[in-house]
From Swiss-Prot:
Function: This protein is one of the early assembly proteins of the 50S ribosomal subunit, although it is not seen to bind rRNA by itself. It is important during the early stages of 50S assembly.
NCBIfam families: rplM_bact (TIGR01066)
Ranges where the record places region Disordered: 128-147
Subunit: Part of the 50S ribosomal subunit.
GO cellular component: cytosolic large ribosomal subunit; ribosome
UniProt xrefs under PROSITE patterns: RIBOSOMAL_L13
One Pfam short name: Ribosomal_L13
Source species of the chain: Streptomyces coelicolor (strain ATCC BAA-471 / A3(2) / M145)
Alphabetized UniProt keyword annotations: Ribonucleoprotein, Ribosomal protein
The protein's name: Large ribosomal subunit protein uL13
GO MF annotation terms: mRNA binding; structural constituent of ribosome
Length: 147
């Protein structure tokens, strides 16, 4: 019997919705990255995008443990000399919580074209409403929440 290698046409994608309220950011990011990569499926292969779509709601209510909210920094670089910019996570979460969640998940995906393709299946929203009701997303429960 030959080893099965999934083809992009063989993959059936589902939609999952994750409520980020009172969930630790790192735990949320690892769960979402695993679903985006398709590691929860028996046909997982690292060289094929077998992942599902992920909708994250209540991104503004995500929790950071310890003093990370005030001490952890988010960095970006413009590409020019001296172009390193940094912002504290509490400022980033207040100004643009969707970007903070996307940045955490993006760091857990492959750093190549396949990772960018996986990241395009991630949808993050600030409130508890999302425009993807027609796709009939299944709720995905993260059992361990912040204390």
């Amino acid at each position: 019997m030959r080893t099965y290698s999934p083809k992009p046409g063989d993959v059936t994608r589902q939609w999952h919705v994750i409520d980020a309220q009172d969930v630790v950011l790192g735990r949320l990011a690892t769960t979402a990255a695993s679903i985006l990569r398709g590691k929860h499926k028996p046909i997982y292969a690292p060289h094929v995008d077998t992942g599902d779509f992920v909708i994250i709601i209540n991104a503004d209510k995500v929790h950071l443990s310890g003093n990370k909210r005030t001490q952890k920094m988010a960095y970006r670089h413009s590409g020019y000399p001296g172009g390193l910019r940094s912002v504290r996570y509490d400022e980033l979460l207040d100004k643009n919580p969707e970007k903070a969640v996307e940045k955490a998940i993006k760091g857990m995906l492959p750093k190549n074209s396949l990772g960018r393709q996986m990241l395009s299946k991630l949808k993050v929203y600030k409130g508890d409403q999302h425009p993807h009701g027609a796709q009939q997303p299944q709720p995905f429960e993260i059992t361990q929440v912040a204390q």
